[in-house]
Amino acid sequence: RFLIGVPSFVVLAIMIIVPIAALRSLKWKKPFIIFGAILFVVSLVLLLLKKPKRYKDWIESCKKPPVVRLSKNGEVVKIDNVREFKWRSLDDYDAAWVTRSYYLDQLDSLDLVVEPLGDSKLFAHSMLSFGFGPERKVVISAEVRKEKGESFSLIAGLYKQFELIYQINSERDALTLRGTQEGTQLYIFPIKASQAFMKSLFISMTGKAGKLTDEPKFYHSLRANCTTELFDHIKKNYDGSISYGRGVLFPALSGKVLHEMGWMDTDLDYEEAMEKFRSGMRVRKFADHPDFSKKIRE
């Protein structure tokens, strides 16, 4: 499928173009150019024709995609395969898939969860946490749906190498999965939002989650990643003007953007807010606490 994280057609093109450059002075360079061009075009056509697949040998944590049903009155979202794993480490966990019904009139909070990638000040994984009461929060995260033995590559993600999934998890699952890794930082930013906006956003995102189960789509490192997918739903449901800015391009800056726009639900200044909403250590400390969602926000 790809070599060292780079799609085969790119590697093949390089392998052909380099010898051609060295043989430019030879009379028979033209056949090489023609052959290389044909091979490149064939590989490109095969890539364009490649379709995402629903059935593969998926890793356990994304084996069961969400099945979503909206009630006739539009007020209850029932979801099968909500993930509620108990994570001790990335490889040590108790698997649990449950069915949950979410009553939209109980929706009372929205948080943006940001996990900076390593020490990066620019790149991060972004998720949304919807609250239906103090300890009933559900996280929706657009992610790569990995096969067994597969690892993520930013370059490979540009060339139809991964399927996209909207993972729906309990907040404890989503945050402890990432918090099990010592040193991993997490930020939970409360967002100022009307219930009407939160409702339409939740319906939009869960609807897309269910649609991907039946109509799979490729993940794309630039156009269909964790942050661009969230932004598309926010823009679609927000009653106002919103532009594709640095918070989408560089999601590790999204906290700063939220604060500048007045969308962060706090009276603290930016530095104080970042310290207040830094939650990685609390996630690890209270992973098994019955009031997990409350404790990690204190």
Predicted features and spans:
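Glycine-rich catalytic cores of cysteine/serine-nucleophile enzymes that process amide/ester linkages
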Residues: 77, 88-186
